[in-house]
Every structure is written in C-alpha cells, then in structure tokens.
Amino acid sequence: MSQAAAQQPSRKKTVISLLVLLALTCIIVFTFKDHWAEITTALAQLSVWQVLAVLAVGLSYPLLEGCVAWVIVRSRLPQFKLRQGLDVGWCGTFGNVVTLGAGAVPVQLYYLHKAGLPLGPGAGLMTLEYVFHKSTVLLYATVMLLLQRRWLAANTTGVMRYLPMAYAVVAVVIVALVLLCVSPLVQSLARWLLGFLPKTEKWQQRRADWLEQLEVLGTESRRLLADKPRCLKIFALQALKLFGLFCLPYLCIRFMGLSPLDFWQVQLLTSLMLFVSNALPNVAGMGSIETAFLLVFGSFLERGEVMSVLMLYRIASYYVVFAASAVGFFIAQRHLTQMEPPKEG
C-alpha cells in the first residue's frame, strides 16, 4: 500500500472544506427561518447545566471512538496507549470534516504509520473498525425495531411507512460489507468479479491495489476475529457509543419539554434515523442526518419542535465535536513529534 494512502489534510483543502461547511450551515439555517422564533424560544428555556450535559454526551462519541481504536490497534501494537487511541479518534473526526467525508481513514493512517503500524495492517484495522461500527448500528436498530415494532406500526403514517424498505436496503449493504471481511467465499467471489475489469493499464493497476487491500483485510479480520474477548470489548464500546448518541435527542426533547415520547421510543427513532441516513448522500457528515431526522421525528413532533431538537442535537453531536476534534488533531500532531515508533507485536 502506497504512502500516499496516509496523509494529513493540506491547509488549502482545510480552508475550502471549512468554507463549504459554512455554506451548508447557512443553507440549513435558511431552511429553518420560518420557525426561528420557535427555535430560539425552545433553546432559551435551557439552563447552563442542561446545555453542558447535552454537550458532554455529544463529546462522549468521539472519545469512545478513540477507545475503540485503542482496543483494535493493540491487537497489532500491544504498547499502543489509550492516549494514542484518543488521538486516532480525533484525527478521524477532524479528517472526515475537513476533507468533506473523504479523508478520515487517510488521516488516521498517517498517525498510525508514524506510531509504528505499517500502512497495510493499519488500513485493514481501520476498515474493520468501520465494519464493527456498521454492524453495531444494524444490531442496535434491529433489536429496537423488534422490541417496539407494534408501537411503531401503530404510529407511523405517510413516508414513514417506507422505513422497512430503507431498513432492508441498508441492512443488505452492511451484511455484504461484513461478509466481505469475514467470509473466504465472498472474498473469493470479489476477486473473481475484479477479473472482469477493463484490461487497460489504469484499471489493472486499480485491480492490483484492490486485490492487495482485500488480502490485507482478510488477514487482519482473521487475526482480530480469532481474539473473541477483544471483539466483545469492541462491540460493547460501539454499543455504548451509540447509546450515548441516541440519548441526545431524548435529552433535548425533555429539557425543552416538547414531547410525550418515552426514553426507549426515542432510542428506537434515533437508531432508525441513523440507519436511514446511511442510505442518503452527505457532504462532510451534513445533509443526510438532517434529512433523516426531519423524516423520522417529523411524525411525532410539530415542525417547529423537531427543528428545535435537531438544532440542539447537531450543535452537540457535530459542531462542538468538530471544534473539539480540531484541538484534538493538533494535540495529536504534537504527540507524534514526541513519540518513538514501537515495534509491531
């Protein structure tokens, strides 16, 4: 795997990305303009402690992502520290935004490579972290759906009736991704399909790169999945991360005094919202969440109410997290200059 696969975001790309982020934010604010009075009234009800509680829960997400990275990377580098895992989490969050969704893994690989992990295994482990995340999203939404399917069926109308179809499509994609990592049969099928690519030099180079990545992914997945206790820790941390994220809308709703929805109903709706957002296009993590949130919660809250909750939810889960990740990213760069790469275990 080439060194170009691991890189830091350039200043020019970062500035462009921040301008795009600002433009998208302005568009979202403009779409809320008809309900701005309701939104400001709802936000004004919050106490300082309530705001701090919501922000703290939002920040738990990247911190737990860092813990997941720490547990996964220690399968290769036993000396890998928790602080370094948190650095990887911040690098991923920062890289995802400043490269408009394209650079989370390359930025993480840059850090891991400097920390002593070869690019191939690093890419394999970060891909597996993504697969663990998607698998947990699927399992979480499935459990919530099975436990509350009757309530959901009795309270959904309009476009919400298409949720099962969206669920099925995203579930198929996630299952296929998981099988690509863990099933030798599916990996063999993928190699066979790559043989049908055009015989030009450009496509054959891509084929060689993809085959190399597939081989590394298979090796790392077999190595990691053989360590059952580690896999259970990863799933537990992923589930805890999602649980905190799904608590956010409930806290927003309760603190604003908006809805009779109970805790587990909000857990279900938020898990479905995240699930549906995976099927929608996004730029730097924006667009898909907002659309899915309005779609899912719009059936249970008034328009002004759902926009108020969405505003606070995104401030806590996106904007504050991104601001914190910018600080975390630059701290991670300082850590890199202070460390000596450990030997691979």
Predicted feature locations:
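Transmembrane helix-loop-helix hairpins in multi-pass inner-membrane proteins
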Residues: 1-41, 92-204, 282, 286-345
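Membrane-helix interface segments
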Residues: 10-11, 47-49, 78-87, 117-119, ...
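Membrane-interface helix starts
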Residues: 13-16, 45-53, 222-236
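Membrane-water interface at transmembrane helix exits
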Residues: 29, 40, 69, 73-77, ...
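A short amphipathic helical element positioned immediately N-terminal to and/or at the very start
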Residues: 37-45, 213-226
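Hydrophobic alpha-helical transmembrane segments
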Residues: 51-55, 82, 86, 123, ...
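Membrane-embedded helical hairpins/re-entrant loop segments and their flanking transmembrane helices
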Residues: 64-94, 252-269
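Transmembrane helical segments that form the transport core of multi-pass membrane transport proteins
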Residues: 221-272, 280
